């Protein structure tokens, strides 16, 4: 079995920044709270809660409130500043830029965002601008629109959505902006190419992670693909595949990927009788 690990793996800079900041605050002995997953990865969240991070939607007691990488609605942010002595905004800079862009364009045209309506990033965005969030093309009466995208969406799926919207409607002015994170686009392109040479693609990342799900869908077009959160989820028959490729979402730590590769080698060794 040949194991090929993608070049673009591990945390993106926004996730790394968020986790590092929370760990530093906890190491300082501060009582840190938040209202949801800092990042969409179960193992990372377990590690942070073990260190003392408190997660609750009802939490009002603490020294420091940390805003998740996905952001929160503007009004909610202002409320939190009145409740907590310190609020640390860990919204990914690329996500923050999306919010500002939506807010600016909403003054002159209708904002249509390609994304998951219930995703935390989209919930936060609607706190900055009255946007329509959907992944399904629809008929629309407004003549002036701007198209934006959730930062973790597939670029190709976003383009297909916009093309369908233009075919279905008669817009007088339609602005198309690529607001997808370039880090996720690079991973998307690598998975698109590398999965073509794989007998099995393994995508490692949280099951609630939008960008990990995107990579799973892309790899599935070209090879047998599984999506796992931990090495324990590797199926016994993984050793029957000739070339196995390993990919990861942007919320997946390098240590987890290393553990998956180690487990694959152990499974291969047991099959060959070398372990």
From Swiss-Prot:
Cited Pfam families: LYTB
Cofactor dependence: [4Fe-4S] cluster
Cofactor annotation comment: Binds 1 [4Fe-4S] cluster per subunit.
Annotated disulfide bonds: none
Pathway membership, UniProt: Isoprenoid biosynthesis; dimethylallyl diphosphate biosynthesis; dimethylallyl diphosphate from (2E)-4-hydroxy-3-methylbutenyl diphosphate: step 1/1; Isoprenoid biosynthesis; isopentenyl diphosphate biosynthesis via DXP pathway; isopentenyl diphosphate from 1-deoxy-D-xylulose 5-phosphate: step 6/6
UniProt keyword annotations, A-Z: 4Fe-4S, Iron, Iron-sulfur, Isoprene biosynthesis, Metal-binding, Oxidoreductase
UniProt keyword Oxidoreductase present: yes
Highest taxon listed in the record's lineage: Bacteria
MF (Gene Ontology): 4 iron, 4 sulfur cluster binding; 4-hydroxy-3-methylbut-2-enyl diphosphate reductase activity; metal ion binding
InterPro entries: LytB/IspH (IPR003451)
Positions that bind [4Fe-4S] cluster: 12, 92, 181
Reaction equation(s) it catalyzes: isopentenyl diphosphate + 2 oxidized [2Fe-2S]-[ferredoxin] + H2O = (2E)-4-hydroxy-3-methylbut-2-enyl diphosphate + 2 reduced [2Fe-2S]-[ferredoxin] + 2 H(+); dimethylallyl diphosphate + 2 oxidized [2Fe-2S]-[ferredoxin] + H2O = (2E)-4-hydroxy-3-methylbut-2-enyl diphosphate + 2 reduced [2Fe-2S]-[ferredoxin] + 2 H(+)
A GO biological-process term: terpenoid biosynthetic process
Residues at which isopentenyl diphosphate binds: 40, 70, 119, 209-211, 251
Family: Belongs to the IspH family.
Protein role: Catalyzes the conversion of 1-hydroxy-2-methyl-2-(E)-butenyl 4-diphosphate (HMBPP) into a mixture of isopentenyl diphosphate (IPP) and dimethylallyl diphosphate (DMAPP). Acts in the terminal step of the DOXP/MEP pathway for isoprenoid precursor biosynthesis.
Protein name according to UniProt: 4-hydroxy-3-methylbut-2-enyl diphosphate reductase
Source organism phylogeny: Bacteria, Thermotogati, Thermotogota, Thermotogae, Thermotogales
């Amino acid at each position: 079995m040949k194991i090929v690990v993608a070049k673009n793996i591990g945390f993106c800079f926004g996730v790394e920044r968020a986790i590092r900041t929370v760990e530093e605050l906890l190491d300082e002995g501060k009582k840190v709270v938040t209202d949801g997953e800092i990042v969409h990865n179960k193992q990372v969240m377990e590690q942070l809660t073990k260190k003392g991070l408190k997660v609750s939607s009802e939490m009002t007691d603490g020294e420091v409130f940390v805003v998740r990488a996905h952001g929160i609605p503007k009004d909610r942010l202002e409320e939190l500043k009145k409740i907590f002595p310190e609020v640390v905004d860990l919204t990914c800079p690329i996500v923050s830029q999306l919010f500002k862009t939506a807010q600016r364009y909403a003054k002159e045209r209708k904002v249509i965002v390609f994304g998951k309506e219930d995703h935390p990033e989209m919930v936060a965005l609607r706190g900055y601008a009255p946007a329509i969030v959907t992944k399904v093309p629809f008929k629309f009466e407004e003549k002036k629109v701007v198209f934006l995208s959730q930062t973790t969406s597939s670029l190709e799926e976003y383009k297909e959505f916009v093309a369908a919207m233009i075919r279905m409607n008669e817009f007088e002015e339609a602005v198309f902006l690529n607001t997808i994170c370039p880090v996720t686009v690079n991973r998307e392109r690598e998975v698109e190419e590398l999965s073509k040479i794989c007998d099995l693609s393994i995508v490692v990342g949280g099951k609630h992670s939008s960008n990990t799900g995107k990579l799973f869908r892309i790899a599935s077009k070209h090879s047998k693909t599984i999506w796992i959160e931990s090495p324990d989820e590797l199926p016994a028959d993984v050793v029957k595949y000739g070339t196995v490729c390993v990919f990861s979402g942007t919320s997946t730590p390098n240590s987890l990927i290393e553990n998956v590769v180690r487990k694959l080698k152990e499974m291969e060794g047991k099959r060959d009788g070398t372990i």
